[in-house]
Amino acid sequence: MRLATWNVNSVRARVARTVEFAVREHIDVLAMQEIKCKTEQFPYAAFEEAGYHVVAHGLNQWNGVAIASREPIEDVEIGFPGMPGFEKGKEGPDLPKEARAIGATIDGVRVWSLYVPNGRGLDDPHYRYKLDWLEALRRHTEDTLAANPGLPLALTGDFNIAPTDADNGDPTVIEGVTTHVSPPERAAFAAFESAGLTDVVRPLIPTGYTYWDYKQLRFPRNEGLRIDFILGSTAFADAVQGAEIHRNERKGEVPSDHVPVVADLDFSHGEDDDDLPMIFG
């Protein structure tokens, strides 16, 4: 399985580029974030013509998530249990849920496409919402793996957190001043490791960014952030054979400000030897 995650920053504006990437790179599963359209406005036909099944969840011109797959998509889940909502200027348990999470099972692998709240500012209510959202996701992850420890599970997407100083090359992103690098955000990200997940790309690609702001020549100066991740359970991580960060997708006409992150997986190595092909020297 070749799995990719990409914050496409408006799928309708970049549908040709997104589909072309998926086909060219032989992507089996593509998790997309910031599709920026309602569910019914998603360009399903372009993906289907290229041989993909698609599920999407969008409410308006903001946020939105989707999963495209070569294989059938099963057990689709919109949002996760305990996921908080948000509405500016309001508090309480019944706030509207944003289009930030969609999960599905593909060939026995549970995949989530996630667009974590930005946080906006350290003194903004959106920052508290971000931390609450991450905590709810962590609890759901723990519950899922406690019920099925051998499940190949992947949390993929834009986490809006640079977990280490090496993941921050943007001079305007400063600890104590801006979001994405605050100790509480980094602790929330690290908590997924305690929940049983591993950043499956970092051991193979220890450095490099996945996002560069459109402003102030951030990309030519390579002043980016590493905020897009594939976090996998033990059963998922053990199957990872390779990884890629497609920096060139930030080039060209009307690029997204994010680039795709790819993991190559082979689940057959866990099968009985009798089921594996024999190779003779």
Tell where the protein language model's regions lie, with residue ranges.
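Active-site-proximal beta-strand elements of phosphoester/diester hydrolases
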Residues: 1-10, 108-123, 258
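N-terminal, active-site-proximal structural segment of metallo-dependent hydrolase catalytic domains
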Residues: 1-65, 271-281
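Active-site beta-strand/loop signature of hydrolases that rely on acidic residues for catalysis
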Residues: 3-7, 18, 22-40, 111, ...
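Structured beta-strand-rich core segments of catalytic domains in phosphoester-bond hydrolases
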Residues: 35-38, 42-121
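Metal-dependent phosphoesterases centered on the DNase I-like endonuclease/exonuclease/phosphatase
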Residues: 50, 133-227, 276-281
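Conserved beta strand-loop-helix elements of the APE1-like EEP
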Residues: 61-76, 218-238, 265
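Surface polyanion/phosphate-binding segment centered on an Asp-His-Pro turn
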Residues: 244-281
